[in-house]
């Protein structure tokens, strides 16, 4: 093999092509406004937006956390308050039930909405593969701006500006997906005991191993399907 061909193959192996991302003047203007601040905050914590990003939501706290990979593990970057979600605790199962999903989701570049009726938005990927297997219905479930929603997670315009920009910049670096895990609460025994009478308890217990793996290793658990339920591995 010639040195030229070897060099070309090596460059293709080492460098991911940049994603073709949906964009708008609004999203560009937002990036100009908020990215310098976010970049300074990332650098101050020794983090790089080119590294993998992980998102997780806790409904009962109305909070979204953003974690960024640093070495082998992920490090907490910052959190954002959720202004509104509908339906309380418990996951979405059908279109029109007014519930906001709980589970393990994947966001890809194609799921960005740079110009939305809710300012900026990203589709969370509901229903996921397990939910499709169970026949759950509904679509267009978003994390978006404003402070009103049915089935989505409304972060305010100020909040979504930063969240959307971080996600966009991560995809711009060549990343192909971002994991979003949505929990009803922190899955410790205290909370599970508090909700022992809930009809959702079996489902929540099925989510707990994924939560526990991240708490132990600070590496997002990979959710697979086994016996019509979640199965986890790192």
Residue ranges of predicted features:
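Bacterial Sec-dependent signal peptides at the C-terminal "C-region" and cleavage site
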Residues: 1-3, 7-23
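A conserved hydrophobic position in a structured secondary element of the catalytic/binding core
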Residues: 155
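Short internal beta-strands
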Residues: 181-183
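Cell wall/extracellular polymer interaction/catalysis modules
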Residues: 18-150, 158-178, 187-234
């Amino acid at each position: 093999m010639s040195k030229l061909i070897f060099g070309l193959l090596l460059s293709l192996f080492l460098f991911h092509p940049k994603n073709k991302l949906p964009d708008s003047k609004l999203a560009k203007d937002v990036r100009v406004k908020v990215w310098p601040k976010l970049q300074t905050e990332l650098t101050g914590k020794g983090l790089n937006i080119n590294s993998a990003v992980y998102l997780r939501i806790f409904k009962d706290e109305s909070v979204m956390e953003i974690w960024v990979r640093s070495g082998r593990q992920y490090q907490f970057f910052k959190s954002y308050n959720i202004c509104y979600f509908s339906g309380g605790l418990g996951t979405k199962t059908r279109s029109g039930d007014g519930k906001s999903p709980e589970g393990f989701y994947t966001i890809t570049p194609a799921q960005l909405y740079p110009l939305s009726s809710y300012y900026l938005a990203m589709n969370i990927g509901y229903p996921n593969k397990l939910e499709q297997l169970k026949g759950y219905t509904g679509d267009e479930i978003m994390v978006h701006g404003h402070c009103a929603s049915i089935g989505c997670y409304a972060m305010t315009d100020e909040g979504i500006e930063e969240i959307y920009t971080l996600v966009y910049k991560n995809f711009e670096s060549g990343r192909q997906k971002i994991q979003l895990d949505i929990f009803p609460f922190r899955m410790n025994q205290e909370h599970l005991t508090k909700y022992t009478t809930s009809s959702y308890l079996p489902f929540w217990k099925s989510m707990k191993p994924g939560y526990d793996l991240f708490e132990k290793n600070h590496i997002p658990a990979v959710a697979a399907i086994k016996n019509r339920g979640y199965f986890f591995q790192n």
